[in-house]
Amino acid sequence: ARIPADQKTRYHAAAVMASNLVVGLYDMAASELATCGFAPADAKAALAALFLGNARHIAEDGVEASLTGPAARGDQATIDAHLSCLSGDSREVYRLLTEVLYRIASRRATPYR
């Protein structure tokens, strides 16, 4: 696609979101697993399976079909429990991205089961 000159910065920001920011999320998740006692290699293996499976599902089926988990189910009790055990940047990122996930869930043709 040809990107208009006045949209190139937005295009680059979108690319950073889909690429570089995912690295930050992965690192935050690995840090939380380390707090749970995971060795770095075990955290890497656990997260790699989740990340690769999710990336494949998104690429093949889109975000609406790929969304699972508490936001997809409208499970606020689980989200609240997650937020209560997180702190700092991890808590804020979780909260902000959960709002995005709720918007994705609202676009589904059929509710998640």
Label each region the model flagged.
Residues 21-37, 70:
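N-terminal glycine-rich phosphate-binding loop for ADP-containing cofactors
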Residues 2-3, 25-28, 96:
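Glycine-rich loops and low-complexity Gly/Arg-rich segments
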Residues 8, 24, 77:
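Short alpha-helical
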Residues 33-40, 102-106:
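Active-site-proximal helix-loop elements at catalytic-domain edges
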Residues 3, 17, 21, 52-56:
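Membrane-targeting and insertion segments and their boundary/processing signals
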Residues 1-18, 39-44:
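Conserved Rossmann-fold dehydrogenase catalytic segment
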Residues 15-18, 22, 94, 98:
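Amphipathic, non-transmembrane alpha-helical scaffold segments
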Residues 44-113:
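NAD(P)-dependent Rossmann-like dehydrogenase/reductase catalytic/cofactor-binding core
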